[in-house]
Amino acid sequence: MSSLRFRVVEKAFQTKAREFSIPEERPSEYFGKYVFNREKMFKYLPGDVFAKLVDVIDNGAALDSGIADEVASGMKRWAMELGATHYTHWFQPLTEGTAEKHDAFVEHNGKGGMMEEFSGKLLVQQEPDASSFPNGGIRNTFEARGYSAWDPSSPVFVVDDTLCIPTIFISYTGESLDYKTPLLKALRAMNKAAVDVCHYFDPSVKKVFSYLGWEQEYFLVDEGLYAARPDLLLTGRTLMGHEASKNQQLEDHYFGAIPIRVAAFMKDLEIQALELGIPVKTRHNEVAPNQFELAPIYEECNLAVDHNMLIMSLMRKVARAHGFRVLLHEKPFKGINGSGKHNNWSLGTDNGIALMAPGKTAEENLRFITFIVNTLMAVYRHNGLLKASIMSATNAHRLGANEAPPAIISSFLGTQLSQVLDHLEVSTDEDMGVLVGKHGMKLDIPQIPELLIDNTDRNRTSPFAFTGNRFEFRAVGSEANCASAMIALNTAMAEQLTDFKRDVDEAMSDDVSKETAILQVLRRYIKTCKPIRFDGNGYSEEWKAEAARRGLDCETSCPVIFDNYLSESSVRMFTSTGVMTKVELEARNEVKWETYTKKIQIEARVLGDLAMNHIVPVATHYQSMLINNVYRLKELFDASEAEGMSAENISLIREIAERTAYIKKHVDDMVEARKVANRIDNVREKAIAYHDTIAPMLEQIRYHIDKLELIVDDQMWTLPKYRELLFIR
Ligand code: ADP
Ligand code: MG
């Protein structure tokens, strides 16, 4: 019965590492080979066009339609030399992936033949039929027009035979239908607010960048085994499967030697990533078996987001070439760690100052403390929203599930930085005033040696940890678009820095120096945002109670957490910064609720199918064999002897009967519960119904299936088991 399972397991065991081509050049030589970067722009564009385009990229100058044709023509020439025949606007709709529609360069030449053509108009703007992308009701199908517009701040690149142009995607009436539009607006708002604050310390600052360095965790599974698991195939996670006797308890996988087959995949992936200009740097085994991590050197946030989207699709492609499937789902396997995507985030200026790194002088440290405290304030004020920004049906399996970050946002600072803030909190104006007066810039700010901070104790349970020169937002899901978290965080920072500037300006007077005013405001903030600081164990029960006392958002229901986007403080934050309108927020929430419902719905269907046509039949078949055995024993032996010999089997027969009955009944109940939920019109209420009634049933049914897996004859079991999925290379 399960010959397929044994065949795929055997094949997976025997699969050798694949060959792949290693470039003859060094990485520094092939880095960015397929990217139209500055070097290429310089080579393929006329001098004046190059200068104008650089102005557009660096200073956000408007794109002069006069140069668009020449830019497009240069791009086309470069792309065609690499073998490209098509181009596409590449955008990030409100699904977890990217979207593209390829058009060939060909046009009629007017003489009955064809020619390669790519105009500025096609580069700059297009109108893909947008009606089938999630839009939360912003457009009805009869008003399907939306358009994509080039984002010159992210360079175009070639994948296979296609020139890919990063674009934003908006409705005809201007509402954003993607992740990039609000991200660019958030970055612009943050830049403006942060530059203003920087001017307290350095009037020459012109621009503040938001930096993002993501760490991408993922699982690899042999593709034959993957294909034999319909749940993995259709939902990205295993909906059933008993824990293997050995999983991660020995902690022997973390940083262990990378298996040869996996190493080949990683090398191939890295080469292709570098060719696409993604500066990948770090790779290692993660905690769980078959779990790995990949991290690049951090980049400007918008580019880093694009690169993460690109690498996720590259990973899928390269994995298949190596006979693997990559699992980006946050929780593919029960009982072992899930995958996250730590978002390392910091701010830095155009003149090279890292705003979240301690400095050497008191003045530098005042600036450092200013940005740290404002970050804490932003996170404190919007902790519920930040949680909503990383929440999804899939990431819900990680959050609060006694691993990875808890479902409460708090920030870990480490002993040293905590002490500095505590010290500032209790200091008085007099301390400060005297010192400022006497020594000019010599403020009473403790020296903070950079090295020490860099080695601060790590707290793996903290969802938002300070790590020396950046904050690490760990709660982001492995499958998510980083933009969601980055939009919320940078917008919160924009609002907070704007408020800070206003507060400091108000506090300054003839008697109160700028430094004193800054310290006064910071001291107040340190007191206000104290509830967000937590250095203890984020997984503990005590913390849940304590966090509730502190007034932090402790909600655990995914669809209810989404409400945070529509709270008064969130709407004020997004609208005052010009990042999103109320209509956009409402539409996006509709998409979130709908997506949530659909994901649970699909899981429920798949589990129902598998239960009824894999598990119950196999269990029943095994049960029949046992029954047969019981009868045969009766024929061979006298009644009392046969009874004694059959006792074990009879209890197994009973257990199988009970569990299969339970499974059948609950699959029926789940269908009924879906019918009830599906009749609810309100998308939010429907999502809540799916969360409250259907999601728990998945777990209950699974429980009995996993118990059956332990007693049914291994020969008969059709689905590859955890021990096979997780330990084969
Ligand atoms: P760890 O696992 O110790 O957190 P990794 O090396 O796996 O460290 O990843 C750290 C990530 O943080 C990398 O992507 C790195 O580029 C990024 N990073 C380092 N410094 C900064 C910074 N100042 N701002 C943003 N990201 C940073
Ligand atoms: Mg990290």
Give the residues covered by each predicted segment.
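N-terminal hydrophobic targeting/anchoring segments and the immediately downstream early-domain regions
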Residues: 1-24, 141-157, 162
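Histidine/acidic residue-rich metal-binding segments in metalloenzymes
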Residues: 13-119, 124-140
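Active-site proximal loops enriched in glycine and acidic residues that flank catalytic Cys/His/Asp
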Residues: 67, 91, 119, 296-298, ...
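Active-site-proximal loop/turn and secondary-structure-junction residues that shape catalytic pockets
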Residues: 67-71, 91-93, 121-122, 169, ...
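Hydrophobic/aromatic-rich, well-ordered segments within soluble, folded domains that form packed cores
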Residues: 84, 88-91, 307-320, 347, ...
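Short linear, low-complexity motifs centered on an aromatic residue
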Residues: 96-113, 130-131, 229, 236-238, ...
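Glycine-rich, acidic/polar active-site loops that bind/position phosphate-bearing ligands
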Residues: 143-328, 337-340, 347-590
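C-terminal amphipathic alpha-helical interaction region
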Residues: 518, 525-729
